[in-house]
Amino acid sequence: WNTDSDLVEQYINALALKEDLPEGDWRIDTYKTHDNLGLWLDKSCLQYFGSTAAPNILSFYPALGVKRDVRSQPELSNYALRGLLSVRYLLTTLAHQKQFHAEADEGWAYYDTLDGYVLYENQNYVPMGFTYDYYLTEAQYEDTVTPTRSNLLMRALVLTEEDAVAYGQYLTPLPTAELNDLTYTRYTQDCADRRASACTAFEMTSAGFHAEATLDRANLMFFSVPYDDGFTAYVNGQETEILRVDEGLMAVLCPAGTVTIDFVYQPDGIRLSRTVTLAALPVFLLYIGHFA
């Protein structure tokens, strides 16, 4: 704790910054700061050190060439990942501002200097929850080159073969020509296209998250949240199947019009443990009564 001269200062500054950041639920990124600033800011952060991780992150990240062990540390050069994961702001320090400018793409605009941090706003930010026009299958996705897969994921949703059969009717198969045009310029256009269909409201809750959207047609709504069997999704109050997409994230089918979406999380096994507990309770009471 005391071995790094500025560690305590950065964490104290982060607590102050938490009160000064704009309202809303979105992700942040950091550059050359100490680990886990997101915990102090109460924000999901791309740069994270911890021994626990959602299992599906261990398939999603490696498919993009991002190492995930006890640390998540996507390189700044993987710019498209920031749009895909709804990163709105990046934090760095005054000491590393010049180095950040040298490495960053042109999509970051200076926002402010607050509480010891220099903030940059992502000009290609896409709010949490958005739809696509195209899809491709996991087999097609795995045939593409790894370095530009993040760009591809801003253009098309990756479905399993089974889900492509069941849900492909709501999307168009990605044309072959679109597999190759993966430039930064096209990325900015893809972000604009995704932003046009993004949720109008997104809020983290104590049990998961809530979102609202208005769609001109039935479509799959994508959320860059790791897939987990503990989630239950409700669209307009009706329980809805959750699809595992992009080799580890989630999507749900939404009808045309105004929709409300709620994801509620219970750790896998909780329901079973409650049943077992209730079944065992009479036996326990008999046991206690016998020896009373």
Describe the role of every protein-language-model region.
Residues 1-194, 206-210, 222:
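Conserved luminal/periplasmic juxtamembrane motif of membrane-embedded glycan-processing enzymes
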Residues 172-292:
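Active-site-proximal, structured, solvent-exposed surfaces of multi-pass membrane proteins
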